Amino acid sequence: MEPSIKYPIYEWELLQDTYYQKSAIGKAEWEYIDPVDFMFAVAPCGGAIAITRSESNLQSNYKYDQVPMYSICVFCLSGQLLQTLTWDKTSLVGMGWNENEELIVVSKQGQVRVYNLLGEFHQFSLGKGVENIGIRECQFSEGGVFALLQNDTFISITGFEEPWRKTYASIPFNTLEYYNIDSWALIPNPFSPDLGMDIVVTVGPHILQIDEQDSQLHSISSLQHVSHISISPNARYLALYESVGKVRVISSDFSKELLDLRLPETVAEASLKQMAWCGNDAVVLVHENLLTLVGPFGGSVPYLYNHTPIVSTEVDGVRILTKDSSEFLRKVPAPLENIFHIGSKTPGAKLVEAFQKMKLKSVFAEKMLLELKDELHDAVDTCVQASLNEFSIEWQKVLLEAASLGKNSLRMYNHQEYVDVCRELRVLNAARDPNVGIYITHEEYLHLGLERLIQRFSCRQLYGLAVQASMWMQIPCDWVYIQWAQTYIKQSSEPEEVVLDNIVKRLSSRKYISYEKIARTAYQEGRLILSTKLLDFEPLAKHQVMLLLNMEAYEQALKKVIETMDNNLIIYVVLQIKQQMAIASFFQILNEYPDAVKVYVEFAKKNDRKTLHDFFYQDDNKQGIAVLAVEDTLKTATVNQRITSLKSAAKVCSESKELSLEEKCLGDEIKLLQLQQTYEDQFTGNFVGLTVNEVVVKLIQINQTQRANKLRSDFQIPEKRFAWLKLRALVAIRDWVQIEQWAGSMRRSPIGFEPFVTEILSAGNKKEAAKYIPRCTQLTTQEKVDMWVQVGDVKSASEEAAKSKSGSVLGDLLERVQTMPESRFVQNALDQLRR
């Protein structure tokens, strides 16, 4: 191997049987600041560092002019200043980060601000009464703030968008006979309804776990005063530091004690500055300028510094920051140990050695590859995984080239995995660049997620890198362009035409990108003209509409929503406008858009008839008002109410010549209702709600023929329709006598006599039906023959057929009835015809 490349094992330290690696990840550029002199907070997963002047250490940091009073300086891990945040002249009690790299700042009065790296923030309070009590300390979880108040009670706020406050149970100091909280930490409670956090508190030699309801005392033998307590990233272990210089590690359920280590007196005598976990495997102690790594079985490794370091736990290690350095301490990942351990004979180590010999054109390289045989696949996988866990780009190349050599010798290998690893390394190395300063490990990358990492690029205004990383990983990046445009609008003082032109030019290459969020930002920044113009580029009208409503550009919103032809969206917009405007102004705007009127009318008929009536009234829409009145009759309980509603509708129609026909129809309906009410009073049965035809039928069936005739005259029922109604009414009640009398009284039936035959026959009375066949003068011989057959009178059918003197008619008839005894009549008629 080239001598210029430092072998990875040179950075390793052996702690009992486990290797740990402390890597320098860049020379800090903040040499004028010693972080230990300030209040600080380190973001997880290689994120930013926030420092501000600490009131508890003013003598040490008064000289730092580079950090202004009442300001928070945010640096990346390489020491570059990212942002300077200003806050009100209030005392801060704590700072913390979430994994979105948002800084959470808490004042002693209970005010909380959540900043992003652009300096934007939103603010809320920890609740009523906190300002008067005051906050002593605070700690942070991914989604919440936990505060110890001056009265020794705990509260929390979870959900920064919609803060939700919880108050924890009180500590029973009188029972414990100790009255000071020495240390505390947050521990997940898997049994709580919201999977929230409990608080572990040490009071003298006692340790308690408290939630909202109660406190639970845990017994730990010979426990002394605990000055520091820390929970591992996986929440399975608790580290306790006792004032006598003893370190204990117990399980988070308090069932097992895993470590009980007393430090040397020379170390224990010094004040412990910090205690933190190195991943989930070891504990780090900071005494002045000494950092001690304590292993799970009691071994330790000391690291001496020129300045007091500050430490911050990560999921796979611990970050170490001093005035002039930035380092990362972790347990050596298994793939790296397999390859680079001295004397390693693992398949991965052999493959790397074979590659190195191949570069030197050694004849032994191919022999070593052949010796791997069945282990070659495992060797390739190990090299690929080791490259992901290696910081050095030179060693990454060695490992990937070795893996490439091995996979090319395999017949069956998923090459896509190799490609994916190369892409991930490209992103990780870009993040670790000193100009970016996000020194993230692969395990932290898996924990954080690709989207959040790219979001960090964007929040640092490294938009080009964010787009490149998205392209490397083949994921959408439109949101990066949107964030760039939003930030540009917020920070630019250029004329709106210039801003618009620059945004459109930059985004023109992106098809189907949404301008709605950009336009919303312009609106929130008070740039209304720019917002409106940006909306013209929004491809989806429904996105335009929502923002136009917020901007109170109601006419534009109505115009845009009609283009969608989405009735649900149209009615939503119309109702929003109605809610925000005076009713007269609402009607005025609505009248200008007939398509919106149609949709609103259909909606209002079912949901808001009063407003619809007012709308028709102001528009002088007589027909609309009349229709509403008529529809209202269907919902009224009594006939008189219906008549009143119909009279109102008729009166409206009478005011317009164009509605004369409607007026007449309404008058007829009123007259019918009045008659129906009269009939119900005089006869049994229901008449109200029936049609004119149904009333006629019912009157005939109850032998009120004269009233039926009167109804026919009043409502001008055509003669044919009345005849049909009367026939069917009499057939329905089987009044054959009245049918016969009625038929006998008519010289000519308006509907003919064929319906008499068919209607009576359908009622099952063939004998009565046969009486009317002779009067069916309009029928052909064949039709009459068919009728006689239907009523079962074959003899009459044969006589009718014989009148035609047609052999074919008689022949067809004979064929139809030849199985019947009466067929002889047909045969006789046929014989007579042939003579």
UniProtKB/Swiss-Prot annotation:
Top-level division of the source organism's lineage: Eukaryota
Keywords (A to Z) from UniProt: Protein transport, Transport
A single MF term (Gene Ontology): actin binding
CC terms in the record's Gene Ontology section: CORVET complex; cytoplasm; cytosol; endosome; HOPS complex; nucleus
Record-linked Pfam families: Vps16_C, Vps16_N
Signal peptide (UniProt feature, chain positions): none
Gene3D superfamilies: Vps16, C-terminal region
InterPro entries: VPS16, Vps16_C, Vps16_C_sf, Vps16_N, WD40_repeat_dom_sf
Swiss-Prot/TrEMBL GO biological process terms: endosomal transport; Golgi to endosome transport; intracellular protein transport; late endosome to vacuole transport; vacuole fusion, non-autophagic; vesicle docking
The family this protein is said to belong to: Belongs to the VPS16 family.
Matches recorded under PANTHER family: VACUOLAR PROTEIN SORTING VPS16, VACUOLAR PROTEIN SORTING-ASSOCIATED PROTEIN 16 HOMOLOG
Function, in words: Essential for vacuolar protein sorting. Required for vacuole biogenesis, stability and to maintain vacuole morphology.
Name of the molecule in the record: Probable vacuolar protein sorting-associated protein 16 homolog
Protein source organism: Schizosaccharomyces pombe (strain 972 / ATCC 24843) (Fission yeast)
Gene name of the encoded protein: vps16
